[in-house]
Amino acid sequence: MSEQNQGQPDQQHSGDHQHHHHHHHHHHHSQQPAQPIPIDPNVNPANRIGRYQIIKTLGEGSFGKVKLAQHVGTGQKVALKIINRKTLAKSDMQGRVEREISYLRLLRHPHIIKLYDVIKSKDEIIMVIEFAGKELFDYIVQRGKMPEDEARRFFQQIIAAVEYCHRHKIVHRDLKPENLLLDDQLNVKIADFGLSNIMTDGNFLKTSCGSPNYAAPEVISGKLYAGPEVDVWSSGVILYVMLCGRLPFDDEFIPALFKKISNGVYTLPNYLSPGAKHLLTRMLVVNPLNRITIHEIMEDEWFKQDMPDYLLPPDLSKIKTSKIDIDEDVISALSVTMGYDRDEIISVIEKANREAAAGGATPTNQSKSTNEVLDAYLLMKENHTLVKDLKKSKSENIESFLSLSPPPSSSFPNPGSTSSAPGVQQSLTYQTLATVPDLSTLPNSTIAILPTSLPSIHRAYMMETKVNDPQQQIPAPQPTKKLKTRWHFGIRSRSYPLDVMGEIYRALKNLGAEWAKPTEEELWTIRVRWKYDSTPQLRVWQRTNLMKMQIQLFQLEPNNYLVDFKFDGWEQTSDESKNDASLDYKQQDLDEVGSFSAYPFLHLATRLIMELAVNSQSG
């Protein structure tokens, strides 16, 4: 990696920088004074949503309009993020969006924009969120590059917020200048945490085209899975910009920019300290498997300098070995926010403690992954502990953290009405494909099916039908105590990743498939070609054709992996395509059949799964 002294050009780049980022209209720009604006009694009352008087439109984000509003009773300023349900229907399933948003209400961190409440109407979901009036990057543009101490203070706040969300299984995936806001004390507030999940399906990041300069190589190359590592890369780009006053990867021509990012080509100015250089070179690593993790960043010497105590994550080693206490305050808060039943919460905690005592998983390991109620309880308990610690340390951030949520709007449903709300499983795994809610929690009239969830919902439905079949003579379980079933895509495994890959290769070989030699970057992806036997009924199968499939291994959580199968199109066998004038038609036929029939793919995926099952039994 070459190093060069950038000297003067840095000052020019801060001007360019403005050009790059401010063609985005974004929500939190505002020039208004800090003191509350008295609401004019003559203001148009139609310009109200619930108890909020709209002051002005702040901008348009990836999710719809964002408006500045003021609570009629308290005068507190909030931002209203208005999501049109029509846009959601295209990209996703509304029931899931509402579950995800209700889980985001539990996130409480001094450096994350708080979601105070959600107002739902027939056409819109309106998120009532904390208002922060400035953007970190306007500040950088005005100041040019920052001294290291100042950049480190911002960076520590960003990393602490990201670590908090990752610990609670939410990845931002779209960290960029517009999402880094500042309050009046120049504290960072990260916006839109958890929202990328709502807008994406199996083919990741439809909204990322806004700021490709900050996107990780695996995101711009369209990888199916992008986990916590993408936030590390984006944070590295942000740190570079703060320290150098310009972007590490920049080009007016998008394909050239993508090439620079994919190759990880950037320069480090000589004026950076060795500690800052070392951290940047560990964060901006193209292969996500070799990239530094958030926890390793928090152990880095340069990073730890002058680190305020309130930003340190809780000591996880203590939590893992201790029993989970039953805290009535947390339980009542949780039943109001998420609609869980008090007895259900207590039985989940006791079960987790029993499993831990029996020498099984620790409370924060296996049980946590199998029960979203426990996830939500631990998250809220941590919030309560953090508040106590902040009070003890008399931190100046306590005000920001505890700032009261606006009183509920008259149009909110009462807390009891949310008790039938489905759980938040979709938020609780790193990738959007991993889980599908158990059917028993879905209201009967509103089952809406995600395209990617179809097989799981079908299986869950079939299983439920069997259970409810009177001929089976199975007594129906009490609905409140019903054991929730989790449905996953692909195959789950607790074996070592390399063993899993070895098993898959062995099964593919037994079935006569062929595969491309994996590159180092794609160690956990297998690109397979498979001859699909012809069937006389379809003229298109009169020739032997190759079906392509991608098999990828994901990590769901420590020691828990998921094997995912993805259909990757058709290919004509090379020996038959020579001198064939009708090749174009054949290819067209193949594409048509591929787009209308999932059976060949499902057939081969089933054979592979059965082969793996046979192998594991005989092994």
UniProtKB/Swiss-Prot annotation:
Pfam families: AdenylateSensor, Pkinase, UBA_2
GO biological process terms held by the UniProt record: CAMKK-AMPK signaling cascade; cellular response to glucose starvation; establishment of mitotic spindle orientation; fungal-type cell wall assembly; invasive growth in response to glucose limitation; negative regulation of inositol phosphate biosynthetic process; negative regulation of TORC1 signaling; negative regulation of translation
Catalysed reactions, as listed in the record: L-seryl-[protein] + ATP = O-phospho-L-seryl-[protein] + ADP + H(+); L-threonyl-[protein] + ATP = O-phospho-L-threonyl-[protein] + ADP + H(+)
Superkingdom in the source lineage: Eukaryota
Chain segments carrying region Disordered: 1-45, 399-423
Compositional bias segments (type: Basic residues): 18-30
Membrane topology note: Peripheral membrane protein
Domain Protein kinase: start-end pairs: 52-303
Enzyme class: transferase
Function (record text): Essential for release from glucose repression. It interacts and has functional relationship to the regulatory protein SNF4. Could phosphorylate CAT8.
PANTHER family recorded: MAP/MICROTUBULE AFFINITY-REGULATING KINASE, NON-SPECIFIC SERINE_THREONINE PROTEIN KINASE
Protein known as: Carbon catabolite-derepressing protein kinase
